[in-house]
Design a protein with these regions (language model features):
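Active-site helix-to-loop segments that bind/position phosphate- or nucleotide-bearing substrates
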Residues: 2
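Conserved mixed alpha/beta catalytic, RNA-binding, or beta-rich assembly cores of soluble enzyme
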Residues: 5, 9-146
Length: 146
């Protein structure tokens, strides 16, 4: 496994602050606000990072083109979520890193017209950065903020 990036303590502190628009509220409030933003912006693609966010979107008939999950919520294992993806890709990505395997899988998924679910053995949090970096312009990258 080739580690391309490793999280430093300095960057860990910076990443505690949300990137982009923070939508606060209950699940129902945030999904309503997000739906309103989607309707207004007419984004070409939605990318979800995290099991809870991905499940909430799909439960509300919002289907991400790419979902990145690790089958964990708050570091506790959960039953895998059915996201209706056309393709599922498994990658390794230890906590606090970004691996070449994960980076390449995200790039390929975003080049595809299929709905892709990337299941991470390790941790998916930092992969949000790769999704933002490689997403088509005006895409929505949606992730949970503890």
């Amino acid at each position: 496994m080739i580690i391309v990036y490793r999280l430093t303590q300095e960057l860990r502190e910076k990443l505690k602050k949300p990137l982009g628009i923070l939508i606060r509220g209950s699940f129902s409030e945030t999904i309503k606000k997000f739906s309103d933003i989607m309707e207004k912006e007419k984004s070409p693609r939605i990318i979800s990072v995290g099991d809870t966010v991905s499940k909430i979107l799909v439960t509300n008939n919002i289907f991400p083109q790419l979902s990145i999950v690790d089958n964990k919520v708050m570091r506790k294992s959960i039953k895998p979520i059915a996201l209706g993806a056309d393709e599922t890709v498994m990658v390794g990505n230890p906590a606090g890193t970004i691996t070449e395997e994960a980076l390449t899988a995200i790039q390929k998924a975003l080049e595809s017209n299929s709905r892709v679910k990337i299941v991470v053995d390790g941790e998916e949090d930092l992969l949000t950065l790769i999704a933002v970096l490689h997403a088509p312009e005006n895409s929505f990258v949606v992730y949970g903020q503890p």
